[in-house]
Amino acid sequence: MAAPAKRARVSGGSPLVAPCPSPRAARAPLPLPAGSSGGEPEGDAVAGFLRWCRRVGLELSPKVTVSRQGTVAGYGMVARESVRAGELLFAVPRSALLSPHTCSISGLLERERGALQSLSGWVPLLLALLHELQAPASPWSPYFALWPELGRLEHPMFWPEEERLRLLKGTGVPEAVEKDLVNIRSEYYSIVLPFMEAHSDLFSPSVRSLELYQQLVALVMAYSFQEPLEEDDDEKEPNSPLMVPAADILNHIANHNANLEYSADYLRMVATQPILEGHEIFNTYGQMANWQLIHMYGFAEPYPNNTDDTADIQMVTVRDAALQGTKDETEKLLVCERWDFLCKQEMVGEEGAFVIGCEEVLTEEELATTLKVLCMPAEEFRDYKERAGWGEEETEDDSLAITDIPKLQESWKRLLRNSVLLTLQTYTTDLKTDQDLLSNKEAYATLSWREQQALQVRYGQKMILHRVLELTN
């Protein structure tokens, strides 16, 4: 799938509107396969899935096996023999993919395509899943047997609100989840439920449930793939998500050793580096911060493993820090005027965030321009505003790498520092509290899964923010 952007510079609306995550996520270790909770034992579920693979032409290399042994979480794929870089691990024929185009109600979904349009773009796939899940003779039943138990998904959207706020306040996750829940409910009652009721012969009462729909949204968010557009198709809408059996079994680490390749007839998983016998095969889904991982997949990478981790400074926080530094009402009005100017230039927004990574500022132009405009002398701002701030001579000065922070003007550094301090106040714990928990193995072991994952998210963000503080001294 196409890798998601690290963060839009001016964000608004639900994360569900964004493209699906790219190649699949690791899941939390708690969920068991759906088949294991009913009648089919776990070993039979794997054997049934492998028989299904042979039947549908899904070619697994004899060098790999599906297993729960030797994996970081749940089911995974392990090398039975050493694998060379470039070797084919498995190939999935397009006929085995589960999508609105391959499901048993594909004709109906195509005819009703206009009525099924939504912000997420996921409704046709979700309806396909709802229909196939209830069908005893669904061609994908052996594939479903390896799914995690839907009632035990660990996404924060399934946490009690109090727990979500207590553990993740300040990280950006609670706000993203609230938008998700609002959009899911709206999508279900305005589009999905009316469609199922209009075709009650195809959707039994057992699947007409907001709870089940929310669980499937989480599963699609974590397990689906999105085929990238061709280079010359950038103007087109993103491709719809689809389910890729076998590919979604792979777990994730940043230093992955496999990659999914798309062709006309097959989707192929290929080793990107040598894999030793007994080692797990990992996919990746792009550069994602820990807050994105826990939001979309229910897990976070332990510090400092996630080299793609980021911390956000809300854009309005920088405005608030600038307002706090004013001495009178006149200065406050000047700050507001400059903020309005930045909004009109689409440099900032009420729901946007400046994104700072481990080694770079990912929104360098936006942050540099904002600091400059909010800190420049009044006369200079008037000239800048008249030129609309976009003179060619300005562009070279608007880059901002982490290593450049100590070289900034003192007024810029002061505003950035105050913005970071305000951001740190939004968390429920301070850095030392989190640090003490992480360094105490016994105390860490007593934490629940959710507490451990939330701690990793908070700590990684705070370490980035504290580094910025040090650089502004």
From Swiss-Prot:
Reactions catalysed according to its record: L-lysyl-[protein] + S-adenosyl-L-methionine = N(6)-methyl-L-lysyl-[protein] + S-adenosyl-L-homocysteine + H(+); L-lysyl(8)-[histone H2AZ] + S-adenosyl-L-methionine = N(6)-methyl-L-lysyl(8)-[histone H2AZ] + S-adenosyl-L-homocysteine + H(+)
Disordered, as annotated region: 1-23
Sequence positions bearing Phosphoserine: 14, 22
SET domain residues: 62-286
Keyword terms: Methylation, Methyltransferase, Nucleus, Phosphoprotein, S-adenosyl-L-methionine, Transferase
Residues found modified as N6-methylated lysine: 63, 179, 372
Source organism superkingdom: Eukaryota
GO biological process annotation, one example: stem cell population maintenance
Post-translational modification, as annotated: Automethylated.
Location(s) in or outside the cell: Nucleus
Cellular component aspect of the GO annotation: cytosol; nucleoplasm; nucleus
Residues engaged in binding S-adenosyl-L-methionine: 73-75, 223, 251-252, 297
InterPro entries tied to this protein: N-lys_methylase_SETD6 (IPR011383), Rubisco_LSMT_subst-bd (IPR015353), Rubisco_LSMT_subst-bd_sf (IPR036464), SET_dom (IPR001214), SET_dom_sf (IPR046341), SETD3_SETD6_MTase (IPR050600), SETD6_SET (IPR044430)
GO MF term set: NF-kappaB binding; protein-lysine N-methyltransferase activity; S-adenosyl-L-methionine binding
Matching Pfam families: Rubis-subs-bind (PF09273), SET (PF00856)
Principal location class: nucleus
EC numbers: 2.1.1.-
UniProt: substrate binding residues: 122, 224, 226
Entry's family note: Belongs to the class V-like SAM-binding methyltransferase superfamily. Histone-lysine methyltransferase family. SETD6 subfamily.
Function: Protein-lysine N-methyltransferase. Monomethylates 'Lys-310' of the RELA subunit of NF-kappa-B complex, leading to down-regulation of NF-kappa-B transcription factor activity. Monomethylates 'Lys-8' of H2AZ (H2AZK8me1). Required for the maintenance of embryonic stem cell self-renewal. Methylates PAK4.
Assembly description: Monomer, homodimer and homotrimer; these structures are stabilized in the presence of S-adenosyl-L-methionine (SAM).
Name assigned to this protein: N-lysine methyltransferase SETD6
Organism annotation: Mus musculus
Gene: Setd6
